[in-house]
UniProtKB/Swiss-Prot annotation:
This is Tyrosine recombinase XerS. Site-specific tyrosine recombinase, which acts by catalyzing the cutting and rejoining of the recombining DNA molecules. Essential to convert dimers of the bacterial chromosome into monomers to permit their segregation at cell division. SUPFAM superfamilies: DNA breaking-rejoining enzymes. Its main location: cytoplasm. It comes from the Bacteria. NCBIfam families: PRK05084.1. Pfam families: Phage_int_SAM_1 (PF02899), Phage_integrase (PF00589). InterPro entries: CB, DNA_brk_join_enz, Integrase-like_cat_sf, Integrase_catalytic, Integrase_recombinase_N, Integrase_SAM-like_N, Recomb_XerS, Tyrosine_recombinase_XerCD. Keywords: Cell cycle, Cell division, Chromosome partition, Cytoplasm, DNA integration, DNA recombination, DNA-binding. One of its GO terms (biological process) is DNA recombination. Residues 169-354 form the Tyr recombinase domain. Transmembrane segments: none annotated. One of its GO terms (cellular component) is cytoplasm.
Amino acid sequence: MRRELLLEKIETYKAVMPWYVLDYYQSKLAVPYSFTTLYEYLKEYKRFFDWLMDADLTQAPKIADIDLSTLEHLTKKDLEAFVLYLRERPSLNTYSTKEGLSQTTINRTLSALSSLYKYLTEEVENDQGEPYFYRNVMKKVSTKKKKETLASRAENIKQKLFLGDETLAFLDYVDKEYEQKLSNRAKSSFRKNKERDLAIIALLLASGVRLSEAVNLDLKDVNLNMMIIEVIRKGGKRDSVNVAGFAKGYLESYLAVRQRRYKAEKQDLAFFLTEYRGVPNRMDASSIEKMVGKYSEDFKIRVTPHKLRHTLATRLYDATKSQVLVSHQLGHSSTQVTDLYTHIVNDEQKNALDNL
């Protein structure tokens, strides 16, 4: 979604929200949370407040009038009823054959609500220096996680990674072979964005940054001499990220055409740009996801930018056998998250079994 459209949608949601959600929005914007994250959270709050009104758990005539007392006095049973509503809602439509929302989607909804409740009960201060209320019912609502061993998850993910020589082979394919399959009209569009697209893919494969971190990169954040980029991690922490040397040529090629091809002026700070009717804009997450999916599907298998992050992490662990180094590269505060990569590259167990 283009940044301008995203901001418009955010303003639309803000216009119907209670004052304390607007306070929450301002607080998280200062962290800063990304606009994409805040947009998704506002969507979840709208859905939740709509349900409160439909379920007669508030007497407010509109969402903006739902008071803090309503949230404070919701019970665990109320929240469980909301979860059940999310899980079964589509099946209530006579014309729909869909199952309920996935557990992943439900968990995301509950995560958004947990963030709001934590703000209201712990983080915010009223005139007396106290939170708005103390009872956090979200702490009593459990989420169901998909049961899967690390080994099983690693095996599933491994099929969608570009390991070994495939990392550079993927870039070479986009650079030299992809165009051969295109019509003349499609070739024109491809050639216009070729350097940019290659630079994005190379950066993701060479640094392991999150999609949102790549989207929010500005020119000032990229140091090609040192091969370091500055990003805003989750939680608003600024971090310096090393970039593998193989990405340098692709990034330099893009920078050589960025200003001319995308009509960039001094005020256009975004590193990755798109151009529509002569107006440059920051390239959005959705466009990058589609671009990565398009090229990867033609090369081997359709993947997301997050799988390119997994690719870098796996290759880095394979080369160093250091979970600490990998966790630092990815911006994680502990090595627990990187346990997955030890399973992806762990061939010792298989070799031992083969020798029995």
